[in-house]
């Protein structure tokens, strides 16, 4: 079950840098913590050892995830993205019809999502409902707080 991941060149490089750091620095630091904890004797009641082993499991899991994502990634070039409809890597200007406010989102992969900077995942409720929409269309999105209604005002590539 390998889902294809679409990334910008910058997003790919960021994940690759994280992977390299985990493999070359973080992994070694965790091994040093394990070695240090082992030197304290009895492992059956060694909280420091257990914490280091848990950290090691988390690091190895993240390494595995990043390797999978990067191996299935397709790097998208923004100049090839169309703006006739909402696609991944398009920036969408929306009018919130309930609050009469405008909001702008850029649709990205889950790995590049950053809601504080207006980057939302295409797998999020908003992202899923925006995909394929055109300027002028009304989008109704079910969210935990109810239904949000937006009008698509503009689609562009930043």
From Swiss-Prot:
Swiss-Prot/TrEMBL keywords: Coiled coil, DNA-binding, Transcription, Transcription regulation
Pfam families: GreA_GreB, GreA_GreB_N
GO BP: DNA-templated transcription elongation; regulation of DNA-templated transcription elongation
Molecular function via GO: DNA binding; RNA polymerase binding
Coiled coil: 8-74
Function: Necessary for efficient RNA polymerase transcription elongation past template-encoded arresting sites. The arresting sites in DNA have the property of trapping a certain fraction of elongating RNA polymerases that pass through, resulting in locked ternary complexes. Cleavage of the nascent transcript by cleavage factors such as GreA or GreB allows the resumption of elongation from the new 3'terminus. GreA releases sequences of 2 to 3 nucleotides.
NCBIfam families named in the record: greA, PRK00226.1-2, PRK00226.1-4
Listed name of the protein: Transcription elongation factor GreA
Source organism of this protein record: Chloroherpeton thalassium (strain ATCC 35110 / GB-78)
């Amino acid at each position: 079950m390998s889902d294809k991941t679409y990334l910008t060149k910058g997003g790919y490089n960021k994940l690759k840098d994280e992977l390299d750091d985990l493999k070359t620095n973080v992994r070694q630091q965790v091994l040093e913590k394990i070695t240090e904890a082992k030197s304290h004797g009895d492992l059956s009641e060694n909280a420091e050892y257990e914490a280091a082993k848990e950290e090691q499991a988390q690091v190895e899991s993240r390494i595995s995830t990043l390797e999978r994502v990067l191996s299935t990634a397709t790097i998208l070039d923004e100049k090839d993205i169309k703006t006739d409809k909402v696609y991944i890597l398009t920036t969408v200007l929306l009018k919130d019809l309930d609050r009469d406010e405008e909001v702008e989102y850029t649709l990205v992969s889950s790995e590049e999502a950053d809601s504080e900077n207006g980057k939302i995942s295409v797998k999020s409720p908003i992202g899923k409902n925006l995909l394929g929409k055109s300027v002028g269309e009304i989008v109704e999105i079910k969210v935990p707080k109810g239904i949000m209604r937006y009008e698509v005002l503009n689609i562009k590539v930043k």
